[in-house]
């Protein structure tokens, strides 16, 4: 039985993936010596929602020294422009970092958040990227908490408003591959917690 079609009108998924693809060249470390690039991260990815709780960090920090996760938080304004549905989307980019090469996690997170904000505001940078307008109301906020600090992680959030079409079809080829996940289970009260980071095989060529 074939998989049914899934309508995407009103969705921010395509917009969020557009932001991810825009930011990757500015924020991801790549190529030889990537593990020594302190002011970049290993991965920029789309996230399902707010990312500010210590409980989430085990899943996303596995085998990483930091990352950036992009989420659409709300759409405070939507309107039809001709035959197209356009929304003003409130995005948040969560920058999370651990210490690296003896550079402090809080300094890394703040520096990368600044690099991210600067990339968002490059004049003409969004031409041809799918957005209707350049970002507005760009802000950065320190999400320090005792819980995240105990996990050895610092988090900064960069937020902004940006107009995007909301009825663009989702391209499965642009979505993150589900290749790794964090498993956690309690077998019984008081029993040891079973935890594991599981890597799945990649797609068959």
PLM region descriptions:
Residues 64, 106-171:
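Acidic-leaning, charged glycine-interspersed low-complexity segments
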Residues 85-100, 152-166:
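Oligomerization/assembly interface segments of phage tail-like spikes and tubes
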Residues 99-107, 122-128, 188-200:
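Short C-terminal domain-edge/linker segments immediately following a structured domain
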Residues 60-62, 78-86, 147-153:
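Short, solvent-exposed beta-strand/turn "edge" segments of beta-rich domains on protein surfaces
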Residues 11, 83-88, 96-124:
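Extracellular/virion structural assembly segments
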Residues 78-81, 98-104, 165-171:
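Short, cysteine-centered beta-strand-loop-beta hairpins and adjacent loop/turn segments enriched
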């Amino acid at each position: 039985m074939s998989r049914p079609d899934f309508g995407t009108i009103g969705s921010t998924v395509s917009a969020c993936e557009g932001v991810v693809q825009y930011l990757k060249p500015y924020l991801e470390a790549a190529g030889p010596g990537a593990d020594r690039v302190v002011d970049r991260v290993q991965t920029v990815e789309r996230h399902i929602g707010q990312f500010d709780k210590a409980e989430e960090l085990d899943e996303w920090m596995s085998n990483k020294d930091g990352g950036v996760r992009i989420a659409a938080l709300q759409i405070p304004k939507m309107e039809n422009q001709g035959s197209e549905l356009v929304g003003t989307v409130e995005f948040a980019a969560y920058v999370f970092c651990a210490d690296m090469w003896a550079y402090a996690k809080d300094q890394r997170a703040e520096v990368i958040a600044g690099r991210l904000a600067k990339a968002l505001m490059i004049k003409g940078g969004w031409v041809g990227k799918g957005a209707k307008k350049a970002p507005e109301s760009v802000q950065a906020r320190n999400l320090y908490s005792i819980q995240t600090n105990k996990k050895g992680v610092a988090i900064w959030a960069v937020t902004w408003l940006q107009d995007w079409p909301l009825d663009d079809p989702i391209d499965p080829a642009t979505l993150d591959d589900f290749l790794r996940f964090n498993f956690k289970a309690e077998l019984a009260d008081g029993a040891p917690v079973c935890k594991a980071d599981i890597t799945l095989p990649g797609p068959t060529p």
